[in-house]
């Protein structure tokens, strides 16, 4: 009897220890969101053993699981893994033009197609494991990293990891790890932004339970059961209607509204802000039960809108697509969250740094680019008076600094998706799919470099991360002068983040741009300032307004001597001219900015030679 008791105790202990030990990995990504899948893929590609935990059945987050399958921005900047994803869409649908089915975007697709693409991309990485239907519960810091508890189909599992990446939709992991964060509108006196509010409050952007509808044919009647408490007046001004009496709103006709998110294969993404299915609620700090109750209301709003389209507008042939989501209600797995917690990071990116990037130094640390405007959805908020102090204006395209990924006080943790360290205002443009995908890719690089070289996250330098990004199709600066496969693209990117020559940002309606101005001559005054920032004791000698080809040669030779770099002679420079793909060598003509960047990058390698810290200051 005594032996049986001892045996039972031993077996119980062994079982308990087995349950506690769980899978071990180098990088653990929590959330298979747009940023999470990119982080996991990139980390694995760099040789780090990586696991992604995803609560639902699909990877891709807002691009797939939330049904926002119309890409916002970055059409001319298909960076990194986002670019790979877009290329896969092109391969599936036949051409880039085949993706331009609606007017809200040039890239629209069926969410299920996007989910299959991401699943296939992840499956190709031998160092990556994806575990679906796994919900995060808690995280505990250990001496060597993190211990994470998650629920997998009703069973608790424990994961151990060196580095943790929070790629959840609402920053739940960051909170569990003790990261300080902000929620909602900021006082302009605190954020330093003229566009911000006049006080701090927890008002966030509206969320949306998007719908993917399908045209079932002219004879079909897909009308759903009338939702409880249905009120058609809520939707009168969603499109032109005799019932719309609002003198301020100028709604489009229904056909225009439907073509907004038209997808391939006679499907429609319904994500309509103008008295459509945007819904205001702030569930960020709620428990699971509270969140479920609020999201049920958001679903109800969308279904009421669907019933309005079917019953009031005569579109009975449109119904929820039965070949998209494997959910009981045919709605997406998750809503489209436009705003989440925003961590207090080692840097805080605000709109001033977008409007006037060269007044600051953070642009030198760029790891993602975007061209979408500052777009806040607040139409569904019930008390519009509280929002009157917010103002929004045009912005150029921009890059996002690396420091937004790193919490100020917690180590061995990277935060991605929409919970990065940006202001409330800036979240309106960094929240979009291409940007968060790039942020995730950078997070994966940062994590992998740290674990593979046994370093702390903050010991990984900005330039190391940027170098890997460039090697993997990424952008550091939002220049659109050259496509990323052009042989001079990387040189312009490297010279750009060094600040030797500066780009010009423009805001043209919603098509925000930044140009390196590659064909323009090099201004002596601008160049002198750019060199002084990096080589403060070097004295540049040049005459006239613009630098000539011969003066460029002389400058490179002089800087080579100053920096004690051997092998930089006028003869070498002339020989390299053709080898580097440059043409029309004439010593007395003005050198173009592209030519100068290519030569300077090749001979003096400032990107490699001059490191910058997380704030963009030379070290």
Task: Indicate residue ranges for each PLM-predicted region.
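Sec-dependent N-terminal signal peptides
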Residues: 5-15
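Conserved beta-strand-loop-beta-strand element in the redox core of flavoprotein oxidoreductases
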Residues: 140-158
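Terminal recognition/anchoring or ligand-binding modules at protein termini
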Residues: 497-619
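Flavin (FAD/FMN)-binding glycine-rich loop and adjacent Rossmann-like elements that form
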Residues: 20, 152-163, 167-469, 599, ...
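Conserved N-terminal/central alpha/beta ligand/cofactor-binding core
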Residues: 42, 48-49, 54-138, 142, ...
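Beta1/beta-strand and adjacent pyrophosphate-binding region of the FAD-binding site
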Residues: 23-33
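N-terminal Rossmann-fold NAD(P) dinucleotide-binding loop
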Residues: 36
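Bacterial Sec-dependent signal peptides at the C-terminal "C-region" and cleavage site
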Residues: 14-24
């Amino acid at each position: 009897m005594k032996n049986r008791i001892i045996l039972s105790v031993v077996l119980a202990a062994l079982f308990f220890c087995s349950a506690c030990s769980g899978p071990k990995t180098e990088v653990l990504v929590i959330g298979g969101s747009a940023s999470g899948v990119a982080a996991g893929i990139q980390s694995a590609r760099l040789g780090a053993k990586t696991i992604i935990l995803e609560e639902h059945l699909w990877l891709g987050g807002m691009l797939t699981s939330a049904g926002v399958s119309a890409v916002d921005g970055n059409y001319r900047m298909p960076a990194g893994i986002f670019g790979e994803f877009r290329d896969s869409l092109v391969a599936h649908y036949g051409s880039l033009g085949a993706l331009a089915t609606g007017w809200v975007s040039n890239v629209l697709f069926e969410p299920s197609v996007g989910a299959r693409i991401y699943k296939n991309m992840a499956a190709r990485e031998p160092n990556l494991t994806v575990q679906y239907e796994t919900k995060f519960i808690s995280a505990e810091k250990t001496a060597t990293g993190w211990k994470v508890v998650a629920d997998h189909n009703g069973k608790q599992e424990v994961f151990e990891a060196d580095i943790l990446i929070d790629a959840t939709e609402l920053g739940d992991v960051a909170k569990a790890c003790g990261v300080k964060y902000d929620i909602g509108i900021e006082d302009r006196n605190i954020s330093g932004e003229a566009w911000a509010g006049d006080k701090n409050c927890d008002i966030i952007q509206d969320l949306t339970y998007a719908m993917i509808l399908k045209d079932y044919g002219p004879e079909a009647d897909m009308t759903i059961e009338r939702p409880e408490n249905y009120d058609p007046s809520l939707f009168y001004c969603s499109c032109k209607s005799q019932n719309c009496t609002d003198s301020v709103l100028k709604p489009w006709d229904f056909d225009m509204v439907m073509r907004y998110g038209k997808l391939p294969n006679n499907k429609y993404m319904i994500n309509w802000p103008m008295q459509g299915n945007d819904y205001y609620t702030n569930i960020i700090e709620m428990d699971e039960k509270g969140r479920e109750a609020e999201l049920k209301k958001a679903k109800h709003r969308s279904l009421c809108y669907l019933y309005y389209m079917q019953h009031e507008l005569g579109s009975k042939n449109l119904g929820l697509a039965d070949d998209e989501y494997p959910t009981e209600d045919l709605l997406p797995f998750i809503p489209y969250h436009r705003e989440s917690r925003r961590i207090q990071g080692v840097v805080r990116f605000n709109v001033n740094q977008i409007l006037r990037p060269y007044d600051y130094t953070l642009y030198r640390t760029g790891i993602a680019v975007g061209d979408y405007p500052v777009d806040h959805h607040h139409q569904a908020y019930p008390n519009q008076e509280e929002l009157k102090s917010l103002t929004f204006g045009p912005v150029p395209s921009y890059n996002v600094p690396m420091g937004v990924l790193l919490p100020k006080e917690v180590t061995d943790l990277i935060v991605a998706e929409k919970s990065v360290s940006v202001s409330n205002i800036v979240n309106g443009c960094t929240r979009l799919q291409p940007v968060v995908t790039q942020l995730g890719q950078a997070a994966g690089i940062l994590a992998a470099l740290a674990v593979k070289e046994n370093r702390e996250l903050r010991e990984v330098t900005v330039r190391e991360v940027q170098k890997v990004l460039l090697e993997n199709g990424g952008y550091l600066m939002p220049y659109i002068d050259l496509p990323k496969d052009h042989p001079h693209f990387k040189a312009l990117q490297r010279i750009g983040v060094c600040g030797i020559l500066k780009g010009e940002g423009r805001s043209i309606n919603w098509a925000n741009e930044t140009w390196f101005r590659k064909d323009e001559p090099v201004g002596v005054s601008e160049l002198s300032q750019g060199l002084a920032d990096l080589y403060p004791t070097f004295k540049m000698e040049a005459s006239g307004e613009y630098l000539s080809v011969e003066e460029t040669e002389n400058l490179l030779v002089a800087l080579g001597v100053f920096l004690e770099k051997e092998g930089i002679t006028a003869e070498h420079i002339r020989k390299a001219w053709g080898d580097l793909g440059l043409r029309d060598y004439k010593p007395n003509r003005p050198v173009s900015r592209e030519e100068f960047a290519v030569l300077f990058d090749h001979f003096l390698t400032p990107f490699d030679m001059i490191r910058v810290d997380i704030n963009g200051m030379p070290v």
